[in-house]
UniProtKB/Swiss-Prot annotation:
This is Glutamyl-tRNA(Gln) amidotransferase subunit A. Its EC number is 6.3.5.7. It catalyses: L-glutamyl-tRNA(Gln) + L-glutamine + ATP + H2O = L-glutaminyl-tRNA(Gln) + L-glutamate + ADP + phosphate + H(+). Pfam families: Amidase (PF01425). It is an enzyme of class 6 (ligase).
Length: 485
């Protein structure tokens, strides 16, 4: 049997019932990678030797009926900005080429404790800055549904690997849509948890008030199973929330009769393609058919999400990325003749164009004379966006809309046009600014390219999000599409 497109849930049961060994699962996954990844280009590094060794250890435990761990023997791919002890972590940048961490991120510790098996590290936009995975220093990942299209970003490798059947689940990070947008483009399920739900310890920081780690899977229930394994308060991350209700699967099958869902008119407004609008309207009718009430509302400050987000995120990035100075670790320019030259040349040569663009933007926004006009004003707009959501959630359980304004664009089309690229974040950035949970699930296709439907929930109410997404998934089954790729 081939396990390449099996769900996490099915693999757990197959291993538990001794119908397959962890070694067989891992072996099949590496065979799939060998066959497909030269085309998809989703992995930056494979941890094959350690993965095979780990799987053999799990085989022995399986034989003794000692199968402890929620993800016993399940292979995983990890975005390359999440620290993995002993495995190269580059953030897809020349700046960190050859950097091998000597400690483990919290999420990796949790996944290893649940006996998941690390397959390798996944490609991304450099330092998570981009929406197409084209800013990676190493390679350009393609969309498994259409090899002329981008997979989205910044977690493009994480989404493409899952869609192509190269891992049953992956982790990504989402600062302004970097899990949900590639999930939408690649036709899979991607969740950005509530800010603070998952520890950021060991996530290479981009924008600390926005970053959040989350799972990418091919089914909603798989997504919930992975989130259960990685949530929880962490003493190493002061922003991780002391909320210990990590049971997202018990209510997942409950119907959604009587649930109140809000559809913001702005989410079907200017810039959203006709195909996306049509798919979302169909999805709304499906939700009504499931017994939910869907009503149109207004989130008037949506249009300010992108400018506010790019000022705040770039400002935080300019601060966070100042640690890459060519001295302690990372790229060290061999041509520098003084300390000042070492700083300038290491950073100029080590960072790519998009990263430098955002550092410049952030430094400018924080500079004397401009701070009030840009950074401070953006924080005020952020509060207005949060207030919009709070007002809606007084009367509604969930917000629904498209994940992205269009389907995946062609490789090369927008890489030299940053403003057009940034516009793709129209519907995802407000969720990060408000710190809310958001999930993208497939809801259609246009010319063979997937369309994503986004559900947005109240803070720490991932349970309801999963319930709605799961019920919708029962009526819109996308699972057969992956094996056709």
């Amino acid at each position: 049997m081939t396990i390449r497109y099996e769900s996490v849930e099915n693999l757990i049961n197959l291993i538990k019932n001794k119908e397959i060994t962890p070694s067989k699962v891992v072996s099949d996954i590496y065979d799939a990678i060998e066959e497909t990844d030269p085309t998809i280009k989703s992995f930056l590094a494979l941890d094959k030797e350690n993965a095979i060794k780990k799987a053999q250890e799990l085989d022995e435990l399986q034989a003794k009926d000692q199968m402890e761990g929620k993800l016993f023997g399940i292979p995983m791919g990890i975005k390359d900005n999440i620290i993995t002890e002993g495995v190269e972590t580059t953030c897809a940048s020349k700046m960190l080429e050859g950097f091998v961490p000597i400690y483990e991120s919290t999420v990796m510790n949790k996944l290893r404790n649940e006996q998941a098996v690390l397959i390798g590290k996944l490609n991304m936009d450099e330092f998570a800055m981009g929406g197409s995975t084209e800013t990676s220093y190493y390679k350009k990942t393609v969309n498994p549904f259409d090899h002329t299209a981008v997979p989205g970003g910044s977690s493009g490798g994480s989404a493409a690997a899952v869609a192509a059947g190269l891992v049953p689940f992956s982790l990504g990070s989402d600062t302004g849509g970097s899990i949900r947008q590639p999930a939408a483009y690649c036709g899979i399920v991607g969740l950005k948890p509530t800010y603070g739900r998952v520890s950021r310890f060991g996530l290479v920081a981009f924008a600390s008030s926005l970053d959040q780690i989350g799972p990418l899977t091919r089914t909603v229930k798989d997504n919930a199973l992975v989130l259960e394994a990685i949530t929880g308060v962490d003493e190493n991350d002061s922003t991780s929330a002391p909320v210990e209700d990590a049971d997202y699967t018990s209510d997942i099958g409950k119907d959604i009769k009587g649930l109140k869902i809000a559809l913001p008119s702005e989410y079907l407004g200017e810039g959203v393609s006709d195909e996306v609008k049509a798919s979302v309207k169909e999805a709304v009718e499906t939700l009504r058919g499931l017994g939910a009430t869907v009503e149109e509302v207004s989130l008037p400050n949506t249009k300010y999400g992108i400018p506010s987000y790019y000022v705040i995120a770039s400002s935080e990035a300019s601060s966070n990325l100042s640690r890459f100075d060519g001295i302690r670790y990372g790229y060290h320019s061999p041509e520098a003749n003084s300390l000042e030259e070492l700083y300038k040349m290491s950073r100029s040569e080590g960072f790519g164009e998009e990263v430098k663009r955002r550092i410049f933007l952030g430094t400018f926004a924080l500079s004397s004379g401009y701070y009030d006009a840009f950074y401070k004003k953006s924080q005020k707009v952020r509060t207005l966006i949060k207030d919009d959501f709070n007002r809606i959630f007084e009367n509604y359980d969930v917000v629904v809309g498209p994940t992205t304004p269009t389907t995946a664009f062609n490789l090369g089309d927008e890489i030299d046009d940053p403003l057009t690229m940034y516009a793709n974040d129209l519907l995802t950035t407000p969720v990060n600014l408000a710190g809310l949970p958001g999930i993208s699930v497939p809801c259609g296709q246009s010319n063979g390219r997937p369309i994503g439907l986004q559900f947005i929930g109240k803070p720490f109410d991932e349970k309801t999000l999963y319930r709605v997404a799961y019920q919708y998934e029962t009526k819109f089954n996308f699972h057969n599409e992956y094996e056709k790729l």
